[in-house]
Amino acid sequence: MSELTIFLRHLDEHVLKGTGMGKPAKAKRGIPSKVDDFNAWYPFIVEAAELVDKRYPIKGMDVWRPYGWKAMRQIDALTHSEMDRTGHEEVNFPLLIPEDLLEKENALVARLKRAREEGVDPDELRDEDEEAGFKKEVYWVKHAGENDLDIPMFLRPTSETAMYTMFPLWIRSHKDLPLKVYQMVNTFRYETKQTRSFIRVREIHFFEAHTAHANEEDATRQIEQDLEIVDRLMDKLCLPIIKAKRPVWDTFP
């Protein structure tokens, strides 16, 4: 869920309290115009609202300030409530993932991507050695103290690789299905482009839910429930949304 979407609706009210219902009073308060110069308005309003402080000495890793973190925790509480209501159970996976798991994912992603581009069944193709997935976007841990690690590790950019390593150990028969878990953790991605609070950062306050099902029908029901969850959350946050299905070219392989 985008932190940006959740916060933007409430920023003007918090920062511009007492200025009336009109546009930001640029001359009176020194606030850039959101309409005329969004690129100037956005960082100003994030700082003025005391959501996060971007001056931490690592680019793209902002410090949550009390007001911003309080708002985020309230949003998290709504999410926890929806997960409990729909039978999801909370887990917490390790921050570090061994390199060999990433290699497996990269090979699979490369094969699925090529199958999609060529319009063939992925089973007809062999795994390729080309780099894909998150390999170029992760933070690596290759030393422990003064010793080189036998197997390098990386900070999770997301948790599919870690979770799906454990799922086969937890699911022994159809009686263990459906499996519905979620977690709220920090993830890390080495963004090389210009960072901007909530829009593109290197440390992300991240919510993810993962499920496993006995058949396609049950998986489809889960998708429908997911849409209902989003509707309920956005309604509680007073945020209008448009639900759309991604085209094939824009989906993760």
Annotate the PLM regions.
Residues 2-253:
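TRNA-recognition modules of translation machinery and tRNA-sensing kinases, especially anticodon-binding
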